């Protein structure tokens, strides 16, 4: 059974940065739903490429079956990992329902790491991070933030109600954020 930590927060909250540090220091494999989707979009002969491209450009959510299949394949490919950080997923109730349908009984969801950060700070980070993403422009970012507020934040509230959320303020310097994240993982691994 795979240990899974969901890493959620608004676009630009530092999910990728913190996941890289957790991977390097704690041995969890970082699976970014967005990176997997972008890679699939670019893969020659992908049956989902055009569909994924349309959703990414519009800032909308890709069908859950596609995302779950990509995540499951990535976990199978790294089956000897300590655990998995799933960054940017689930993004809504449909994602969570689809995840449970496809992955129920195959994984141990340890907790949800919620990186909270003011939206204006997140947008500024995205515009200046220089990753060359097609969706790092003001128009797409506004749509992504709107999608986050309408769809993802309610799923975070759901996880909060069932006691799974561990919130860390990610507006601070990365070293401070990471120190708090390490404490969250240490507490979770003592249980």
UniProtKB/Swiss-Prot annotation:
<dbReference type="GO" id="GO:0036431">
    <property type="term" value="F:dCMP kinase activity"/>
</dbReference>
<feature type="region of interest" description="LID">
    <location>
        <begin position="128"/>
        <end position="136"/>
    </location>
</feature>
<keyword id="KW-0067">ATP-binding</keyword>
<keyword id="KW-0665">Pyrimidine biosynthesis</keyword>
<dbReference type="InterPro" id="IPR006266">
    <property type="entry name" value="UMP_CMP_kinase"/>
</dbReference>
<feature type="binding site">
    <location>
        <begin position="88"/>
        <end position="91"/>
    </location>
    <ligand>
        <name>a ribonucleoside 5'-phosphate</name>
    </ligand>
</feature>
<dbReference type="InterPro" id="IPR027417">
    <property type="entry name" value="P-loop_NTPase"/>
</dbReference>
<feature type="binding site">
    <location>
        <begin position="60"/>
        <end position="62"/>
    </location>
    <ligand>
        <name>a ribonucleoside 5'-phosphate</name>
    </ligand>
</feature>
<protein>
    <recommendedName>
        <fullName>UMP-CMP kinase 1</fullName>
        <ecNumber>2.7.4.14</ecNumber>
    </recommendedName>
</protein>
<dbReference type="InterPro" id="IPR000850">
    <property type="entry name" value="Adenylat/UMP-CMP_kin"/>
</dbReference>
<dbReference type="GO" id="GO:0036430">
    <property type="term" value="F:CMP kinase activity"/>
</dbReference>
<comment type="function">
    <text>Catalyzes the phosphorylation of pyrimidine nucleoside monophosphates at the expense of ATP. Plays an important role in de novo pyrimidine nucleotide biosynthesis. Has preference for UMP and CMP as phosphate acceptors.</text>
</comment>
<dbReference type="GO" id="GO:0005634">
    <property type="term" value="C:nucleus"/>
</dbReference>
<keyword id="KW-0539">Nucleus</keyword>
<feature type="binding site">
    <location>
        <position position="95"/>
    </location>
    <ligand>
        <name>CMP</name>
    </ligand>
</feature>
<dbReference type="InterPro" id="IPR033690">
    <property type="entry name" value="Adenylat_kinase_CS"/>
</dbReference>
<dbReference type="GO" id="GO:0006207">
    <property type="term" value="P:'de novo' pyrimidine nucleobase biosynthetic process"/>
</dbReference>
<dbReference type="GO" id="GO:0005737">
    <property type="term" value="C:cytoplasm"/>
</dbReference>
<feature type="binding site">
    <location>
        <position position="172"/>
    </location>
    <ligand>
        <name>ATP</name>
    </ligand>
</feature>
<dbReference type="GO" id="GO:0046705">
    <property type="term" value="P:CDP biosynthetic process"/>
</dbReference>
<keyword id="KW-0963">Cytoplasm</keyword>
<dbReference type="GO" id="GO:0033862">
    <property type="term" value="F:UMP kinase activity"/>
</dbReference>
<dbReference type="GO" id="GO:0005524">
    <property type="term" value="F:ATP binding"/>
</dbReference>
<feature type="binding site">
    <location>
        <begin position="12"/>
        <end position="17"/>
    </location>
    <ligand>
        <name>ATP</name>
    </ligand>
</feature>
<feature type="binding site">
    <location>
        <position position="144"/>
    </location>
    <ligand>
        <name>a ribonucleoside 5'-phosphate</name>
    </ligand>
</feature>
<keyword id="KW-0418">Kinase</keyword>
<keyword id="KW-0808">Transferase</keyword>
<feature type="binding site">
    <location>
        <position position="38"/>
    </location>
    <ligand>
        <name>a ribonucleoside 5'-phosphate</name>
    </ligand>
</feature>
<dbReference type="GO" id="GO:0004127">
    <property type="term" value="F:(d)CMP kinase activity"/>
</dbReference>
<feature type="region of interest" description="NMP">
    <location>
        <begin position="32"/>
        <end position="62"/>
    </location>
</feature>
<keyword id="KW-0547">Nucleotide-binding</keyword>
<feature type="binding site">
    <location>
        <position position="129"/>
    </location>
    <ligand>
        <name>ATP</name>
    </ligand>
</feature>
<dbReference type="Pfam" id="PF00406">
    <property type="entry name" value="ADK"/>
</dbReference>
<comment type="similarity">
    <text>Belongs to the adenylate kinase family. UMP-CMP kinase subfamily.</text>
</comment>
<feature type="binding site">
    <location>
        <position position="133"/>
    </location>
    <ligand>
        <name>a ribonucleoside 5'-phosphate</name>
    </ligand>
</feature>
<dbReference type="GO" id="GO:0006225">
    <property type="term" value="P:UDP biosynthetic process"/>
</dbReference>
<comment type="subunit">
    <text>Monomer.</text>
</comment>
């Amino acid at each position: 059974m795979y240990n899974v930590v969901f890493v959620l927060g608004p676009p630009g909250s530092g999910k990728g940065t913190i996941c890289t540090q957790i991977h390097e220091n704690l041995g969890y494999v970082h699976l970014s739903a967005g990176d997997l989707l972008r890679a699939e979009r670019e893969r020659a002969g992908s049956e989902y490429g055009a569909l994924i491209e349309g959703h990414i450009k519009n800032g909308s959510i890709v069908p859950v079956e596609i995302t779950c299949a990509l995540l499951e394949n990535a976990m199978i490919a790294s089956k000897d990992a300590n655990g998995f950080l799933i960054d940017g997923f689930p993004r809504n109730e449909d994602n969570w329902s689809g995840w449970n349908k496809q992955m129920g009984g195959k994984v141990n969801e340890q907790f949800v790491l919620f990186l909270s950060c003011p939206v204006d700070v997140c947008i500024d980070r995205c515009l200046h991070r220089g990753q060359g993403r097609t969706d790092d422009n003001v128009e797409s970012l506004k749509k992504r933030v709107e999608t986050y507020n309408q769809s993802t934040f309610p799923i975070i509230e759901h996880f909060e109600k069932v006691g799974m959320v561990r919130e860390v303020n990610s507006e601070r310097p990365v070293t401070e954020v990471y120190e708090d994240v390490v404490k969250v993982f240490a507490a979770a691994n003592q249980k």
